[in-house]
């Protein structure tokens, strides 16, 4: 709502957030069985098709244009360097611009085969270094939201739970 979306758009954005990587289901058997091995250039090109595959899946299932375009363009960077269409600035639908910020943040605070998760504070610092990729107005809304006292406490609790689980695993 801080970004000026209607209640209906907020609801649709939550659906797009749940479905934004649905196109990866089409490629899971090929790419995600690799485990710790780095992806080849051809595999990276293939993975970059997931927004287009997600677009096809959601189009066939009659989702709204807002949801479909948010999914299709969620890897577009504000400076035009993203994919699949190299859109820039306001050419990128607002839902996709919001998803881009959230998707990058979620990726940074998650473990990956090639690196450990960053703290949420470090993730924000990394995103600030790459600010050209994001709509500044929306990024400032994002910062306001995640610096809310309740949200900060939830992020800290999630990090602590993760650390506690890791410690339990170490002793087994």
Model feature map: region roles:
Residues 1-172:
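Histidine- and acidic-residue-rich, metal-dependent catalytic cores
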């Amino acid at each position: 709502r801080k970004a000026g979306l209607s209640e209906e758009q907020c609801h649709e954005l939550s659906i797009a957030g749940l479905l934004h990587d649905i196109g990866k289901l089409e490629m899971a058997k090929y790419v995600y069985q690799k485990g710790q091995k780095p992806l080849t250039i051809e595999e990276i090109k293939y993975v970059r098709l997931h927004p287009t595959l997600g677009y096809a899946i959601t189009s066939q299932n009659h989702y709204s244009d807002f949801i479909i375009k948010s999914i299709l363009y969620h890897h577009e960077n504000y400076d035009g360097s993203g994919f699949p269409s190299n859109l820039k600035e306001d050419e990128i639908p607002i839902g996709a611009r919001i998803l881009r910020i959230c998707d990058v943040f979620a990726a940074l605070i998650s473990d990956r085969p090639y690196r450990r998760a960053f703290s949420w504070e470090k993730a924000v610092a990394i995103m600030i270094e790459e600010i050209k990729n994001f709509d500044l107005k929306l990024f400032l809304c994002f910062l306001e939201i995640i610096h809310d006292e309740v949200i900060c406490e939830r992020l800290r609790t999630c990090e602590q739970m993760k650390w506690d689980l890791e410690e339990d695993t170490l002793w087994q």
